[in-house]
Regions:
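Loop/turn elements at helix/coil->beta-strand transitions in domains of secreted/extracellular proteins
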Residues: 56-58, 86-89, 126-128, 147-148
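Non-globular targeting/processing and membrane-anchoring segments
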Residues: 1-54, 58, 166-269
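Thiol/disulfide oxidoreductase modules built on the thioredoxin-like
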Residues: 124-126, 133-175
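Solvent-exposed loop/turn segments at secondary-structure junctions
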Residues: 66-67, 96-99, 136
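Short active-site neighborhood of thiol/selenol oxidoreductases, capturing the structured segment around
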Residues: 47-77, 89-94
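Hydrophobic/aromatic beta-strand patches that form the interior of the parallel beta-sheet core
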Residues: 91-93, 131, 151
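Structural microenvironment flanking redox-active thiols in thiol-disulfide oxidoreductases
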Residues: 71-124
């Protein structure tokens, strides 16, 4: 477990980004149970793990206002919510800010955390409740501190599926279908990165600029290739996030091809 000062970072670092790329050994996993919680929502109600055991499957998602992965996966989750909301409870946990900056500083009080959760719910028009983790991230620590992961439990409260990134809609779709039929999903543990990361990179510059210049600068320092791809993808902002990144990769490929062909041309003597 990280210390309070490490957990509530003010600058994204290479280590933070690398830690996000895989579940730790102690992360809740299929066959186990979620850590118990009883937390307030942005609407002033309370939600507990006990509310769902024996009654309804639960999809628990981590997210934050400044997180590009959250911003890019929320539209996908909203489409799934339309299909499964009557049978499965969707709940998001407001955790630490993924990309703090001058406009979205790392919250160190419950009041600040509630403010960001409300802003997230309003910006993305989220139909599900958001519960507020404590200022020091007690629940987030127990969930392995991932920025936009999710866990799906069955009616008995047993985890039947987890995903490192909520944007893996293919994996999640089959898991939601399975739990509605009281079956185990074919895929129970997803660490797929390509599609979720393409979506997140497509939103990254937009989200870091929202947080402030410091957040944008931190990405250039922590992961220059990713920051460069995000900058290029942002030029295609009218497109959906995933296709912004696809367009950026295509543009980069064309550029490299042109440069390579120019270098191969014989020089006139």
């Amino acid at each position: 477990m990280t210390s309070a000062s490490q957990y509530l970072y003010d600058h994204v670092t290479t280590k933070v980004l690398m830690d996000d790329m895989s579940f730790g050994d102690n992360a809740p996993r299929p066959g186990g149970r979620l850590p118990e919680f009883d937390l307030a929502t942005v609407d002033g109600e309370r939600i507990s793990t006990r509310d769902f055991v024996g009654r309804k499957p639960l999809l628990l998602i981590t997210g934050s206002y400044s997180c590009p992965m959250t911003a890019s996966s929320d539209p996908v989750l909203k489409e799934l919510y339309k299909k499964f909301a009557n049978e499965i409870a969707f709940v998001m946990v407001q955790v630490r800010e993924a990309h703090p900056g001058e406009h979205s500083e790392q919250p160190r009080s419950m009041e600040e955390k509630i403010k960001y959760a409300r802003a997230l719910k309003m910006r993305d028009e989220l139909p599900w409740p958001i519960v507020i983790d404590d200022a020091d991230g007690g629940l987030h620590h127990a969930l392995d501190e991932k920025p936009n992961a999710l866990w799906l439990t069955n009616r008995e409260g047993v985890i039947i599926y987890r995903a490192l990134w909520a944007g893996d809609d293919t994996g999640l779709q089959q898991a939601l279908d399975a739990v509605c039929r009281s079956r185990a999903p074919a895929l129970q543990d997803s660490s797929r990165r390509i599609v979720p990361m393409a979506m997140g990179i497509g939103k990254m510059r937009e989200m870091t600029l929202q947080s402030g210049p410091r957040a944008a600068h931190d990405m250039w320092r922590a992961a220059p290739p990713m920051a460069a791809m995000a900058w290029l993808a942002d030029l295609y902002r009218p497109l959906p996030p995933k296709w912004r990144t696809v367009a950026a990769v295509a543009t980069l490929g064309v550029g490299v091809t042109v440069i390579a062909s120019l270098l191969k041309k014989p020089r006139n003597r």
